[in-house]
């Protein structure tokens, strides 16, 4: 059957919400059931989980180009549908200088890269509600890594290979072109069978991204449909694609492919056996070199924590790694990148002057019940961080360009007398003795506490006395330093605590009322340096809707 005939039976392109192509079929998902009183014998109509689907066997007459034309029509309609959701809703929890979505749900940063004298950053977005569903990519640009400008909704879940979500991936700057690699997610049938393909897109002269379709359609042997989040690098004279994967034994591993042209990929092997049973799935891989060492970053899921306060299965890790002349990868030594409540799916980019800068999602996959949901949005990205490899450790430092947002320094005496900062956007730098407790974002009822437990040499972050609705409330970090040096970046509803010059970091969403701007220190009296942080440019398409 011709595709035009099927579209006519479907009631026209405007009645088509998705296109699928499972196992030699063409399936059109419809807003409304077709009006045709009698369908041809080779066309079936069924309701699949409340969605009407019209399907027919795919013949040689139906080309990929024809399917792509339907995908483009759906994409244009999807982009128009996001326009009302590109207006930021006013909210006391909205950050002043972090990236947040105007509405809906933000998750992983994607495609973080320096290309043709500009920084590009994308993020996963579901515009219509605070839920994980049918992911889009938002495109931002910056000249300085501080002030980000909304460019477009770059990718939408419009095609047969990504109909249920444009999942995470990375960008490649090659010659004059900016390429995007991502995982296309589809769900098929009443059992919502997952089907994943690795896909590519390329930016055209108008700054729009044209999908090139799947570049890897089939699963490698021994892997489930949970294989995603491509990271593409150029090494040893060829392109390599790194993917987070799950084996048939439900163990997380790193899947590696190679290519000569970015379009045709060949599977090499799975890596990570030396870690044994290290989670049931690995997500969001990144790979980079720093001071002559190679590093592998990923999100292992299902690792048990030794601390009873840590109940979340979604973890973050960085491993020192090696790659020999044959391309074989070995994972040597690993650590958490962040010890706080809300940090996942980080990506890194190399700046124009050679620094390695990290951006993460300040959230977790299972958290969808924050107070900001009452105002129609959830989650934000972390502050950008510079990475340093020194004395066998990874150190993280706030991006130096953030200093341009700082006020003049103020000396602040921290004591048990509450000082009103009258803001939740600041940079606090202080060295504390063991045996004291710092309270932040404080009023008579709410606060977050940072306790320096002298007996156990534990730094304890406690957000149980906040408005948090979901997630853990205590994090603990073992330290052996004689004092604890802190740099705390605060922004309305978040804290990023850099400990002992960035040897450790604790990143957390902290929700307290608008008037909870007090700070106090109990058990000691110490001078601190305080900078107020000015707002960065809003990363939205339109003005804030008050």
Curated annotation (Swiss-Prot):
It catalyses: Hydrolysis of terminal non-reducing beta-D-fructofuranoside residues in beta-D-fructofuranosides. The active site is at residue 108. GO terms for biological process: sucrose metabolic process. Gene3D superfamilies: Exo-inulinase, domain 1, Glycosyl hydrolase domain, family 43. It is an enzyme of class 3 (hydrolase). Disulfide bonds: none annotated. GO terms for molecular function: beta-fructofuranosidase activity. Substrate binds at residues 105-108, 124, 167-168, 228-229, 283. Belongs to the glycosyl hydrolase 32 family. NCBIfam families: scrB_fam. This is Probable sucrose-6-phosphate hydrolase. The lineage of its organism: Bacteria, Pseudomonadati, Pseudomonadota, Gammaproteobacteria, Vibrionales.
């Amino acid at each position: 059957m011709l595709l035009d005939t099927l579209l006519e039976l479907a009631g026209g392109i405007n009645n088509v919400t998705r296109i699928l192509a499972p196992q030699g079929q063409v399936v059109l998902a419809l807003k409304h059931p077709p009006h045709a009183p009698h369908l041809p014998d080779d066309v079936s109509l069924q309701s699949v989980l409340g969605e009407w689907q019209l399907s027919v066997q795919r013949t040689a007459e139906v080309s990929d180009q024809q399917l792509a034309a339907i995908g483009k029509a759906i994409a244009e309609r999807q982009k128009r549908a996001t326009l009302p959701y590109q207006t930021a809703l006013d909210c006391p929890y909205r950050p002043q200088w972090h990236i947040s979505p105007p509405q809906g749900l933000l998750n992983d940063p994607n495609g973080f890269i320096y290309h043709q004298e500009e920084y590009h950053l994308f993020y996963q977005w579901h515009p219509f509600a605070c839920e994980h569903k049918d992911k889009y990519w938002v495109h931002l640009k910056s000249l300085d890594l501080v002030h980000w400008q909304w460019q477009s909704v770059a990718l939408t879940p419009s095609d047969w290979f990504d109909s249920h979500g444009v999942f995470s991936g990375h960008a490649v700057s090659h010659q004059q072109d900016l390429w995007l690699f991502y995982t296309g997610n589809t769900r098929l049938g009443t059992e919502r069978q997952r089907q994943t393909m690795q896909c590519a897109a390329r930016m055209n002269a108008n700054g729009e991204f044209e999908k090139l379709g799947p570049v890897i359609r089939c699963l490698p042997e021994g892997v489930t449909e949970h294989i995603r989040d491509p990271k593409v690098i150029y090494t040893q004279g060829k392109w390599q694609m790194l993917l987070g994967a799950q084996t048939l034994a439900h163990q997380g591993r790193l899947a590696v492919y190679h290519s000569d042209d970015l379009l045709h990929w060949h599977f090499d092997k799975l890596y990570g056996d030396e870690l044994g049973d290290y989670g049931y799935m690995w997500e969001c891989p990144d790979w980079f070199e720093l001071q002559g060492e190679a590093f592998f970053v990923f999100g292992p899921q299902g690792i048990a924590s030794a601390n009873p306060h840590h109940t979340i299965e979604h973890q973050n890790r960085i491993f020192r790694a090696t790659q020999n002349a044959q391309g074989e990868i070995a994972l040597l030594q690993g650590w958490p990148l962040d010890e706080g409540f809300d940090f996942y799916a980080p990506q890194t980019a190399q700046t124009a002057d050679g620094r390695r800068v990290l951006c993460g999602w300040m959230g977790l996959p299972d958290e969808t019940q924050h107070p900001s949901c009452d105002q129609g949005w959830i989650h934000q990205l972390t502050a950008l961080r510079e990475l340093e490899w020194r004395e066998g450790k990874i150190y993280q430092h706030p991006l130096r360009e953030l200093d341009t947002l700082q006020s003049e320094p103020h000396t602040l005496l921290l004591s048990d007398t509450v000082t009103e900062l009258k803001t939740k956007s600041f940079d606090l730098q202080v060295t504390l003795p063991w045996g004291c407790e710092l309270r932040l974002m404080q009023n008579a009822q709410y606060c977050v506490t940072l306790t320096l437990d002298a007996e156990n040499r534990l730094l304890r972050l406690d957000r149980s006395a906040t408005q948090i609705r979901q997630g853990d409330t205590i994090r603990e970090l073992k330290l052996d330093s004689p004092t604890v040096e802190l740099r705390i970046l605060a922004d309305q509803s978040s804290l990023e605590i850099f400990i002992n010059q960035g040897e450790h970091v604790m990143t957390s969403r902290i929700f307290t009322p608008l008037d909870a701007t007090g700070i106090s220190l109990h058990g000691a009296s110490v001078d601190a340096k305080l900078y107020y942080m000015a707002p960065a440019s809003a990363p939205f398409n339109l003005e804030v809707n008050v």
